[in-house]
């Protein structure tokens, strides 16, 4: 919600629904298991609930999304029944559900503990933009 470039971004209206609801729908359409939105803002939880989804409120002071997910897991998966978690950012309203499924494929290898989706940088200016996340790969 505290985006400096677009304050309130998760609730930005896209075709009559908040952005976060579009992301939740894409994740649900992937069919990979339960989808829970971890959030610190009651407005986000209310939007997800109104759409029929499940949201878990977390502390607002987490330094990362991974920390927020860990807190949410402590309440929704107390028995550690799930062996994988997908950390899907709330600002990807058009993500293809097939991409969500694809991130699980590497985890079928017992030697793999984590998988991250990346895409090639297509414009030179993105190389120097601090708002574009980069990944170093060895292929």
Predicted regions and their residues:
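Residues at the C-termini of beta-strands that transition into short coil/loop
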Residues: 15, 59, 118
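Residue-level signal for alpha-helix termini/capping positions
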Residues: 28, 74-78, 108
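N-terminal glycine-rich phosphate-binding loop and ensuing alpha1 helix
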Residues: 1-39
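Conserved core of the sugar-phosphate nucleotidyltransferase
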Residues: 95-139
């Amino acid at each position: 919600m505290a985006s400096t470039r677009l304050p309130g971004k998760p609730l930005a209206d896209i075709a009559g629904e908040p952005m976060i609801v579009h992301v939740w729908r894409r994740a649900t359409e992937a069919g990979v298991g339960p989808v829970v939105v971890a959030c610190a803002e009651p407005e986000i939880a209310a939007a997800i609930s109104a759409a029929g989804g499940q949201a878990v409120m977390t502390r607002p002071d987490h330094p990362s999304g991974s920390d927020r997910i860990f807190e949410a897991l402590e309440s929704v998966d107390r028995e550690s029944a799930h062996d994988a978690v997908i950390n899907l950012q709330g600002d990807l309203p058009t993500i293809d559900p097939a991409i969500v499924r694809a991130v699980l494929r590497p985890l079928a290898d017992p030697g793999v503990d984590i998988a991250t989706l990346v895409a090639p940088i297509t414009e030179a200016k993105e190389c120097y933009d601090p708002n574009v996340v980069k990944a170093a790969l060895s292929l």
